[in-house]
Amino acid sequence: MNVEINGSPILTTLPIFGGIPLTATLVVTWSIMLLLTLFCIWLTHDLRVDHVTTRQTVAEFLVYTAQNFVDSNMGTRFSHYAPFVAAIFSLSLLSSLSGLLGVFSPTADLSTELAWAVLVFVLITATKIKTNGIGGYLKGYTQPIAVLTPFNIISEIATPISMAFRHFGNIVSGTVISTLIYAALGAASHALFGLLPGAVGDLLSRIPFLSVGIPAVFSLYFDWFSSFMQAFIFCMLTMMYIAAAAEAD
């Protein structure tokens, strides 16, 4: 049983700035963002006050859900973060589920989660500076005593890194387990039907019967449920850190 798991493949190299590799992560991520943008435009065009369409009802439901999600976890003064949280959640969920279509999942590439985490880190830092000012923000690194400054800096940097690795680790571990289960069922099918005598056994042993249907059961968790939970947890951590950063020191 040979199992091989690789990183994001390089599709081509753009002949600019000495050659920029165009990876599957970039292509799939931008494709998902384009589809999300077109979907939002389709949902929100031709909005009405009377004779509301089903499309508008769905759009209002999604907006209300995102707004309520942010308000209930961060407070109403952070309502303006609802579009950002909804975008991160949608992008994370669809990026993880894109692997079901046979393309490379962007969330299986650590650079994707690191980019999101850096963006969240910038928002956290900006919120702290807005709340306490530059002086108060820098002074916060010396609390409660100045000797802890290096540890406070490390703790600050560790926040986005831990968010990225937690999300990446859970997605990749699910991919690895699903791949191992699929490969093991294929090997078991080959061994089981190979016990049949003659040409019938030789023919049936080449068809991975056990790999059809059974992996779908595990996919409900490792692909669908896990993808939803990882997107949900990443958004929860984002809201928690930003809300905490808005508290005056």
How does the language model describe each region?
Residues M1-D249:
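Selective transmembrane helix interface/packing segments
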